[in-house]
Regions:
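Non-ligating segments of multi-cofactor redox enzymes
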Residues: 1-144
Length: 144
């Protein structure tokens, strides 16, 4: 069984609850410059705001997995999410270059950071933190 987190942007009210949940769940140190992996906001001309996501789409043909020279990125056999082992990441950035949605970031220590779909939560029959806290339901965990 494979999953994905889907964003229904029209339902987003830009409350940033998902952003905060991602920071909390992943112990992201924004003061050091580390970035959350979840939805953020983009601003369009004339002050229009739209929801945008920097979260991994967990592509079925994930180029990031293929280009990683140390096997840092791999697909979880249970959830189907593209996950990583940051202890083997050398920070070369090859994965980020091929990501079609700019979902791969590098932490202040130079190692990879990306949405892993809250993989361990999903394995334990829980929703990803961003999905669980979303007050409008614009983020949903779906089977694919």
């Amino acid at each position: 069984m494979s999953y994905r987190i889907r964003l229904f942007a029209k339902d987003c009210v830009a409350c940033n609850a998902c952003y905060e949940a991602c920071i909390d769940q992943n112990d992201i140190d924004v003061l050091k410059g580390d970035e959350p992996f979840r939805t953020g906001l983009e601003y369009e001309p004339r002050s229009m705001v739209k929801a945008a996501t920097s979260a991994c789409l967990h592509c079925s043909q994930a180029a990031c997995i293929e280009v990683c020279p140390h096997g840092c990125l791999y697909r979880d056999e249970v959830t189907g999410f593209v996950v990583y082992d940051d202890t083997v990441c050398i920070g070369c950035g090859e994965c980020a270059k091929v990501c079609p949605v700019d979902a791969i970031h590098f932490r202040a220590d130079g190692r990879i950071g990306k949405c892993d779909g809250c993989n361990e939560r999903v394995k334990n029959a829980m929703l990803p933190a961003c999905v669980q806290c979303c007050p409008t339901g614009c983020l949903r965990l779906e089977e694919v």
